[in-house]
């Protein structure tokens, strides 16, 4: 039996504790494996945020780790993909992130800028890393056929959580596997109001 532990390398939120927790989590998993305490094989699924300039530096120490077997390329900037409605994003995250309206506006503007100016190169570098390692890669929160076509052209094999029927259909047509979340199927809909897994 195999488990893929999905851990974030980079984040679109100002939550440094996620990065701080990464090394202890991976060390703990390795110690448990070495002690024979795990009942199945644990491999690493690297969830890579393309809007974060720290993603690749955080990932680099683990590129030779034999547990690294899968990579997702994520873009959680508002205005597209998971969060096409910026106002919904603002209202959803203001309380969660304990920000004022002005602080949230600055946060949104920064993420939108990162998505436009930084993400394309970070994404290209991650694709190169994935191919160099010979591991499968997944796109994430594909919203449009163009998102899926980009993923296909980069050699990605899986579309995680397509957010629209158009993206899911294009993924199927291009030979990418669609993956939806169990909670979405149980609830009958996405947390963000995107397409229900039951429709696919």
Segments (PLM) and residue ranges:
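Conserved beta-strand edge residues that scaffold enzyme active sites
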Residues: 6, 11-13, 77, 143-144, ...
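Hydrophobic residues within beta-strands of alpha/beta enzymes
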Residues: 5-7, 71, 159
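Active-site-adjacent C-terminal substructures of enzyme catalytic domains
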Residues: 44, 136-200
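A generic structural signal for ordered alpha-helices
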Residues: 7, 37, 104, 108, ...
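Metal-coordinating catalytic core of metallo-dependent amide/deamination hydrolases
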Residues: 12-142
